[in-house]
Amino acid sequence: MAVGKNKGLSKGGKKGVKKKVVDPFTRKDWYDVKAPCMFATRQVGKTLVNRTQGTKIASEGLKHRVFEVSLADLQNDNDAERSFRKFRLIAEDVQGRNVLTNFHGMDLTTDKLRSMVKKWQSLIEASADVKTTDGYLLRVFCIGFTNKDQLSQRKTCYAQHTQVRSIRKKMVEIITRDISGSDLKEVVNKLLPDSIAKDIEKASQGIYPLHDVYIRKVKVLKKPRFELSKLLELHGDSGKGGSGEPGEAGSKVDKPEGYEPPVQEAV
């Protein structure tokens, strides 16, 4: 026989009595997730967090959350070229009921990557660590595939090792040139139409023609010190509102001349 105290009897509770079930959602609040001004759709979605209770502050629980959103949703566009690209946004500050986010990375969907890899062609990949003018260290990955010449009768379109090395060098040069001279906002604006990949495809035509050239992934390795003023500037007026609507401000009321406030009977 086991020796020990019966916790149920010591507390005076009856054995088999069910505990009162409390819905956990009654202790939570909804917050609006706001994307930076580079994107057409600013309202990304909503997120849940437990209400402020004791030392646990709700806004602290929201910070550093990462949201992954399709570019088609961010740009409010059904274009197939945008649907397979995902942008990662990280929550950096909370203003009222608005969660202000910043760019945290980019990636292609797995199904798109798998569909591009085929037989009888060479896959060329390159990556570079580049620092932006505002102090962000980014690791950028690029991918491309050799294209078959229309006049060629050959089944394959394999590039020679020297050609692959030349194209890879060209990829790193263009990525470094386009990102090192831009701040994070300009980099995101270049990633939206994928202009860097188009420049690489055009520059590689003299070495070996390519197709399906994309910036495959962007990772944020290091960030500068957080500044609220820069984040608010990135969001425009979306974070200025208090607990009410975004950007909502009070209006000034003109008082008549000689106006005196009424005397209150009780305080």
Swiss-Prot record:
Domain of life of the source: Eukaryota
Pfam families for the chain: Ribosomal_S3Ae
GO molecular function, one term: structural constituent of ribosome
SMART domains: Ribosomal_S3Ae
BP GO annotations: translation
Main location per the UniProt record: cytoplasm
Keyword hit for Isomerase: no
Keywords: Cytoplasm, Ribonucleoprotein, Ribosomal protein
Annotated stretches, region: Disordered: 234-267
Matches recorded under InterPro entries: Ribosomal_eS1, Ribosomal_eS1_CS, Ribosomal_eS1_euk
Keyword Cytoplasm: yes
Subcellular location: Cytoplasm
Transmembrane portions of the chain: none
A GO-annotated cellular component: cytosolic small ribosomal subunit
Assembly behavior: Component of the small ribosomal subunit. Mature ribosomes consist of a small (40S) and a large (60S) subunit. The 40S subunit contains about 33 different proteins and 1 molecule of RNA (18S). The 60S subunit contains about 49 different proteins and 3 molecules of RNA (28S, 5.8S and 5S).
Homology family: Belongs to the eukaryotic ribosomal protein eS1 family.
Name the record gives this protein: Small ribosomal subunit protein eS1
The species this protein was found in: Biphyllus lunatus (Beetle)
Lineage of source species: Eukaryota, Metazoa, Ecdysozoa, Arthropoda, Hexapoda
